[in-house]
Amino acid sequence: MKKILNKPENYVDETLAGLCLAHNDIYRQPQPRLITRANSSDKAKVGIVTGGGSGHLPVFTGYVGEGLLDAAAVGDVFASPSADLMADAIRAADNGQGVLLLYGNYGGDIMNFDMASETVDFEDNIRCTTVLATDDIASATPEEAHKRRGVAGMIYGFKMAGAKAQEGATLDEVTRIAQKTMENTRTIGCALTSCTLPAVGHRSEEHTSE
């Protein structure tokens, strides 16, 4: 695949800036690495926030919009966003009805979102609930399903929770439908080659075809 990068170290920031310039009717970037809805509803509704490392487009920023997510915090490629950035994403999504945090089952994301949730609860009195996406059946056995990663299946959670929030449902109602969706979603992915990190410039691993 051909790709054009100005400087690999600027890949994430330039990608997000380009996204907002190309679709300024949908996206807004109030600060670096934070994408929110450009035209939020005036009515009070439950906010929905996600976040994670870059390199998985259109996740996460591509699902910010009406009936979907209200904000997404973005880290470096394959790296969790900071807890401070996640807290700012929660604040940006808050409409006074609480905020659902819906993201993948990764250690760094869990740690930072937990800290962000505690911060906004203490400093801003924002109530948050959390639903983890654990749809990737290739990453753990059924007996250890709680260890499974969240990948493409979380998109269904974004849509179901986002639609419920848009209807004016409570935080508990939005959380329940997101949890039910994730509990009933399974995915598996495959790739023909290993990935290439922009800052490295070559494949992370080389595999011999069987």
Predicted regions mapped to residue ranges:
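Short Gly/Thr/Asp-enriched flexible loops that form oxyanion-binding sites at enzyme active sites
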Residues: I110-D124, E144
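Short glycine-rich or small-residue beta-strand-to-loop segments that form or flank ligand, phosphate
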Residues: K2, V46-G53, L69-A72, G98-G107, ...
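Generic secondary-structure signature for well-ordered alpha-helical cores
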Residues: A17-R28, L69, A73-V74, R91, ...
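Glycine-rich oxoanion-binding loops at beta->alpha junctions
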Residues: H56, G65-G96
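Short alpha-helices
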Residues: V131-N184
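N-terminal amphipathic/basic leader segments beginning at the initiator methionine
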Residues: M1-I48, H202-S204
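Glycine-rich, flexible N-terminal cofactor/catalytic loop recognition
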Residues: P32-E66, A73
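Conserved small/polar residues in nucleotide/adenosyl-binding loops
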Residues: E205-E210
